[in-house]
Design a protein with these regions (language model features):
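Conserved coil-to-alpha-helix start sites within the AMP-binding
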Residues: 3-14
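Active-site glycine/GP-rich loop and adjacent strand/helix microenvironment
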Residues: 8, 20-238
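Short hydrophobic alpha-helical segments of the AMP-binding
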Residues: 17
Length: 238
């Protein structure tokens, strides 16, 4: 359900999925009712989209009277936006699938920089193509394993516009111990925010993803929100 246009997500995944023998249904974006029917009629087993659109699709499916028993969905590969654990649980419940996260950037290659395995204990970085570091956003110093900072990526095999220590502005941590799945690639945690959208309220670092985690856990509250910071006297209020 990624848009087939200048956005790198759809075409980037399309040919990779065909390479491993999958049949791709290029639904693109929009016309949600039609997409629900495609899921049902074609017996789709894996959904690729943003997590928020998957959540919306599950709501539309229920409105159409299409139950999870009529679908064959088993896996959801989501990306292009942050996905909190609470939103992931809602998507899994809504469609009855197993959700994984994928990280990528248009500047690097689109999707496929890193992705979760079945254990979901971090996103495995494809280190045969990318060298990842985490730095202090202010000083540029490389941080140790497990320390939070800005993700910096160097492309190792990209021929068109290679990137050397590209500053993503995404905040994460790196871990190097082997995963239970057997892969030995370094793993990055889900990004908690960006260096350019972090809010500091009365000396406290506030990330929009933290606010979303609380909102998603509340009934009758959607995943869409706006944060407004006001100055009252000499103090900021959120």
């Amino acid at each position: 359900s990624f848009g087939y246009g200048l956005f790198t997500g759809a075409l980037g995944l399309h040919y990779g999925l065909e390479k491993i023998g999958a049949t791709v249904v290029p639904a693109s974006s929009g016309n949600t009712q039609k997409q629900v029917m495609l899921l049902k009629d074609f017996g789709v087993t894996a959904l690729v989209s943003t997590p928020s659109y998957a959540l919306y699709m599950s709501e539309v499916a229920k409105e159409m009277g299409v139950s999870n028993d009529e679908l064959k969905l088993r896996l959801g590969l989501f990306g292009s936006e942050g996905c909190t654990p609470e939103m992931r649980m809602q998507v899994e419940k809504g469609f009855g699938l197993f959700a994984t996260d994928n990280y990528g950037m248009s500047e690097l290659m689109g999707p496929g920089v890193s992705g979760e395995c079945e254990h979901r204990c971090g996103l495995h970085i494809n280190e045969d193509h990318f060298l990842a570091e985490v730095i202090d956003a202010q000083t540029g110093d490389v941080l140790r394993e497990g320390e939070s900072g800005e993700l910096v990526v160097t492309t190792l095999t990209k021929e068109g516009i290679p990137m050397l220590r590209y500053r993503t502005k995404d905040i994460t941590r790196l871990h190097y111990e082997p995963c239970a799945c057997g892969r030995t690639f370094a793993r990055m945690e889900k990004t908690t925010g960006r260096t350019d959208d972090m809010l500091k309220i009365r000396g406290v670092n506030v990330f929009p993803s933290q606010i979303e985690s609380v909102l998603i856990s509340l009934e009758n509250i959607g995943p869409h929100y706006q944060l407004i910071v006001r100055r009252e006297g000499y103090m900021d209020t959120l």
